[in-house]
């Protein structure tokens, strides 16, 4: 039934477009530029990639960047050359670029490009018949700096402190901009350049993020910042939807040049379409003369556009680290996570929570279990014992809790520590710390449960009331504190996501995913899929919907469009809704709060 409905809806969308129409999604990441193509049925039909270190070795980057101590940057010219190269690959493959109706994409977040006063006139050359490559027209004189800070840069501790002092601390910074001040965020990076490179800063007429840099190249003129990506700058007042006067003044006060607002082109764009692709790409590569460019956005923002995520849906990426993305209509910021304006849903936000200790912490427990098994010392990558322990309910661990942080953790913000405790299930209070549990196998279950429970309690303030309730006898008036949030336990007992989507390497592990699903407690299903192209694919979907919506061919919002037309056959439905197990973990919320208090 579901398949027939989806097929009918897909045909309806297909009927609004010409046959054999295509949509491109770029992914300009740190190490490569990928370009993905889908057809009108949302099927991936072609892909090309340029790996910077391998395909453009003359830039002498290491994994796409230059590293000088804490300063990590990328050569901007390399991106221009990569764009020509990836489109040349499409041309060589005889892909019909003349049937591409729209393009969009994803770019590494936070990086900044510093255009000179000559940039606009040089970009105008892209609207004439091309005779040479991009680097000839958009030459080095187009830029006041030849490199762009990369998100891995951590040289701005001083500037982050100045930012937070300007606003009144990390909590007020998060309230204003959606995040506390971070090394990689664009505002502190701009401030550093204004302070340490005054000549380059004064030569800068316009500052772009990587996203609107690429959009500008494609349309042949400078375009404003894309609003969702601008939320990763520590400069944008999200509630007021404008740049913060105080933070712009901080940058202006550090330079003779008092024009930061003008450099940022005054305000981000809110348009679905930035313009038509410029003549350079039409003449050189055969693009359709009416091909539209939807503004590029940031990589994490494009990721949520690659899946049919609606309000109260959660995406859990289980990799070396754990990242949780969710769609919410609640603006509830915290210094320990990030909030961005949603790139395609008005009046919605993307929440992002990043944990440092993910797979590596679990692997340590796995290895310890394997070393105890006879003749298995060499098979430390075998998950059999670990998985059996995670799913084994024969031995109760209901009064046990542990945190396993072999590395310093981001959420909560603490140094490396492992700690195991026994708690009173009736009160939730910690009774004692223990060096080990009665069975080492309990560590496997407890590490997965505590990781999942941390995700659950931290997404709770961003979820709508789901009318959930606990069957356990708990004191719902107990005040629970996680990070900067302090509220009664009842506030954590009536919030559940609708759907949870699992991606990443560890999502292939059935035991880990099942336990995460039990703890998080989605009410309308749990799903798993592989997403090697998520950023570029999100760009494809954004391009397609933006064109159709802007041209009045469809009237549905992005989330409904993607839910109706998503290729659900690539998605695996896993782990049925489990109300009983979700309720079981309610008794561990207070103990987790109490345990985290002892870590600070």
Curated annotation (Swiss-Prot):
Observed effect of gene inactivation: Impairs growth in culture media with D-xylulose as the sole carbon source.
EC class name: transferase
Primary localization class, coarse: cytoplasm
Alphabetized Pfam families for the sequence: FGGY_C (PF02782), FGGY_N (PF00370)
E.C. designation(s): 2.7.1.17
Residues the entry annotates as binding ATP: 358, 505-509
Keywords: ATP-binding, Carbohydrate metabolism, Cytoplasm, Kinase, Nucleotide-binding, Phosphoprotein, Transferase, Xylose metabolism
Residues recorded as bearing Phosphoserine in the entry: 244
Subcellular location: Cytoplasm
GO molecular function, one term: ATP binding
Family: Belongs to the FGGY kinase family.
Physiological role: Xylulose kinase necessary for growth in culture media with D-xylulose as the solecarbon source.
Protein name as catalogued: Xylulose kinase
Organism: Saccharomyces cerevisiae (strain ATCC 204508 / S288c) (Baker's yeast)
